């Protein structure tokens, strides 16, 4: 959702250093608003010393206290599922997994993983509610509409974007399963 161009998206990823080895993985059909920041593992400091300050950044001999990769906290890859909507000015911390179909409200800070098809808001982001019942969420996770062909998605646009569409799909697929 960048107002200028998607090429500027990389500007939203902070403290990503290849030598650390973490990845930002973003699923299909995500709406990521302007101002979203992905903080990667390179932002983490050692916390086991008296100070957390990274003196090695000074160079000129100060790098003698450069921590090894093993000494730095590593939270893992940051994963954004499919069909996720992330509101404006959200900050996502390292190692967070945001489940398929989730919504993150504007100005939130996500510090823990988010369940699929749920809404989170605040700093730190807290669970607000599920978008659908557990039965419907389970169905949607199995359906994986984002993996359909472009033609199949196009043919089902009205269903995918309507409130009644979920019931229609559940009925359609339950009948299909009963036949098979």
Curated annotation (Swiss-Prot):
Annotated CDD domains: LbH_XAT
Keyword set includes Transferase: yes
Keyword annotations from UniProtKB, A to Z: Acyltransferase, Antibiotic resistance, Repeat, Transferase
Residues of the signal peptide: none
Assigned protein family: Belongs to the transferase hexapeptide repeat family.
Organism: Lysinibacillus sphaericus (Bacillus sphaericus)
GO terms of molecular function: acyltransferase activity
EC supergroup of this enzyme: transferase
PANTHER family, A to Z: ACETYLTRANSFERASE, ACETYLTRANSFERASE RV3034C-RELATED
Name of protein: Probable macrolide acetyltransferase
PROSITE patterns membership: HEXAPEP_TRANSFERASES
EC nos: 2.3.1.-
Gene Ontology biological process: response to antibiotic
């Amino acid at each position: 959702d960048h107002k200028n161009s998607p090429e500027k998206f990389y500007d939203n990823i902070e403290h990503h250093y290849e030598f650390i080895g973490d990845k930002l993985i973003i699923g299909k059909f995500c709406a990521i608003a302007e101002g979203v920041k992905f903080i990667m593992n390179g932002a983490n400091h050692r916390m086991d010393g008296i100070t957390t300050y990274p003196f090695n950044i000074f160079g000129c001999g100060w790098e003698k206290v450069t921590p090894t990769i093993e000494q730095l906290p590593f939270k893992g890859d940051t994963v954004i599922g499919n069909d996720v909507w992330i509101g404006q000015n959200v900050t996502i911390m390292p190692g967070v997994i945001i489940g398929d179909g989730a919504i993150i409200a504007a100005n939130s800070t996500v510090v823990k993983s988010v369940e699929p098809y749920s809404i989170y808001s605040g700093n730190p982001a807290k669970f607000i509610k599920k978008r659908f019942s557990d039965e419907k969420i389970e169905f949607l996770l199995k359906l994986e509409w984002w993996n359909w062909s472009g033609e199949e998605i196009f043919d089902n646009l009205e269903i995918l974007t309507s409130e009644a569409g979920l019931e229609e799909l559940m009925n359609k697929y339950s009948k299909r399963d009963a036949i098979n």
